[in-house]
Amino acid sequence: ARHLLLPATDTEGLHLLCSEGEFDDLLADLALHRLDVVLADRPAPVNPNLKVYSHALGEAALMWYASPALRALSDAAFPACLDQMPLLLPSRHAAVRARIDDWFDRKSLRPHVAGEFEDSALLATFGESGLGAFPATEWSHDELTGQRGLQLLGRCDEVVEHFYAISAERRVQHPLVQKVLGQ
């Protein structure tokens, strides 16, 4: 989310309030104007009773990372190495999870899932501690390999995570939301 919000963070006097919640609950709060925007991994469903609008922000390929100690456990090339180490995955609530599972099937991978996480930052923290290898978007690469010292296992261009800003207005009026949308 940080990458998506960067265009709005150069605003003087900015006060961000970022909340997490169930997708449907966030959309309901948005429709009631309790929120200015919802950042999501999927567009809002078509619902005549819910006046919200999805704006595509972009997409990013997934890359797989592991701690150096975990990577040392396997000499197999990517993606076969994923079968030889525990994995940490987004929970099934994340839209990308179904695409990851489909990719495992296409590659005939049967990995051991050591943990499932709603929060990608928490997932990366446990990955950094060596609990398992994990996917993250290419936007996180420099932070994960530089600041956190993780090793890149491989790039997975076949699995892409999509990002949307969902608003309660078709033509967004809020100036910070306009910045996020690149307007």
Regions found by a protein language model. Name each.
Residues 1-46, 117:
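Central regulatory/effector-binding core of bacterial HTH transcription factors
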Residues 13-17, 110-114, 162-164:
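Residues at or immediately flanking beta-strands
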Residues 18, 37-39, 54, 64-65, ...:
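Generic preference for hydrophobic
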Residues 19-20, 89-90, 116, 134, ...:
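Active-site-adjacent beta-strand anchor residues
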Residues 22-26, 31-34, 41, 95-151:
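Hydrophobic hinge/microswitch elements
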Residues 51-92:
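Flexible hinge/capping segments at coil-to-helix
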Residues 52-63, 146-160:
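Short beta-strand->loop
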Residues 73, 151-183:
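A late-sequence structural motif
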